Amino acid sequence: MSSASLLWCHSGVSTVRFGERIFTLVAGDLLFAPEEAQVADDSQGLVLNIRFETLNIMGPARRIHLGHVWNDRLTFEYSRSLFGKETLSPDIARLFTDRVPTPPLPAPRKARAVAQVLVSNPADQTSLEEFAEIQGVSARTLQRQFLKSTGYSFSEWRAAQRVCVAASLLAHDFSISVVANLVGFAATSSLTRAFRRHTGATPSTFTTGQIGMGSAGHPPRIPATTTFAEAHQDQQLWIYSGTATVTTPGYCRFMGQGDMVTIPAGTQTRIDVAAGSIAFPVPVGLDEWGMDLTRVVAVNNQQPKPLTILEQSEWSKLSEELLNTPVPVQM
């Protein structure tokens, strides 16, 4: 299991701690922490701890605000983790991927030395001619080295580097005017022009309410899923929203929102959840009439993952058995 944490604040306000850092999450926040994070006991919000063997997210802690429109999509991702899936969905991992590429460093030693100065301090105002004199080459030679090895002229490369850094700062709540000054643009209008040229968007697209390196937009649709799994101990399956079908040798049941069915320990089961639907495994003994997402989170925080995904050979055998064993469908 990855030691990193991915936390979705479904509702309310919560305090999250990891290492020496403290984050306050509000409804609609998604937090990635490179180490295990803990939700404070006195938090008033509902936080879903989305745990996978592999998150495919790298780098420092980041909090991004998606808004309540992403609630169902992230709740579905939480359900995937409880069903034993090993990897975070690519469309969620991509939310943390930089959408403004860092310009490539030039290969020639003189040009690379200049580029490294600008990486360390994007606001540096040294001109091409001054850099050339420092490096002991002509301005024309330095310009040619940048253009040939990166595809950018010197001024274009500097602007691209500034835009890359600016996008990161904007995603961390710095104002556009402050960011323009920090990365070396004389005015916000200069930053805006550079953004349009290098990203096709304005700086406001990268501010709070959007995602780090670009707008998150509307959440992707919840896909239909099929899971072949085995319960470690007696489990129940609760349909949070939509519909699902549970099939075992000799048994098949179609279920709707709010329904619950028991999966006996050791039973190999096929679970088909319809598109736009969400289902959760929960311990035996819970009453379907009192079930809600808060209870799902509480009980699953106290137990290991309840289901194990079958190996391909196992689910292939189960599929053949289900196909050749006609059973009545229960509604």
From Swiss-Prot:
Write out the GO MF terms: DNA-binding transcription factor activity; sequence-specific DNA binding
KW Transcription (keyword) present: yes
* A UniProt-annotated Pfam family: HTH_18
User: What are the GO BP annotations of this UniProt entry?
Assistant: regulation of DNA-templated transcription
What the entry lists under InterPro entries is as follows: Homeodomain-like_sf, HTH_AraC, HTH_AraC-typ_CS, RmlC_Cupin_sf
Entry's induction text: Repressed by DtxR under iron excess.
In the record, which residues are listed under signal peptide? none
All copies of the HTH araC/xylS-type domain together span 112-209
Which keywords describe this protein according to UniProt?
DNA-binding, Repressor, Transcription, Transcription regulation
Which superkingdom, per the lineage?
Answer: Bacteria
Reported phenotype of the disruption mutant: Under iron limitation, the ripA deletion mutant shows a 2-fold higher aconitase activity and a higher mRNA level for the acn, catA, leuCD, narKGHJI, sdhCAB and pta genes.
Q: Which residues bind DNA?
A: 129-150, 176-199
- Task performed by this protein: Under iron limitation, RipA negatively controls the expression of the acn (aconitase), catA (catechol 1,2 dioxygenase), leuCD (isopropylmalate dehydratase), narKGHJI (nitrite/nitrate transporter and nitrate reductase), sdhCAB (succinate dehydrogenase), pta (phosphotransacetylase) and katA (catalase) genes. Binds to the consensus sequence in the promoter region.
- Name of the protein this chain belongs to: HTH-type transcriptional regulator RipA
Q: Which organism is it from?
A: Corynebacterium glutamicum (strain ATCC 13032 / DSM 20300 / JCM 1318 / BCRC 11384 / CCUG 27702 / LMG 3730 / NBRC 12168 / NCIMB 10025 / NRRL B-2784 / 534)
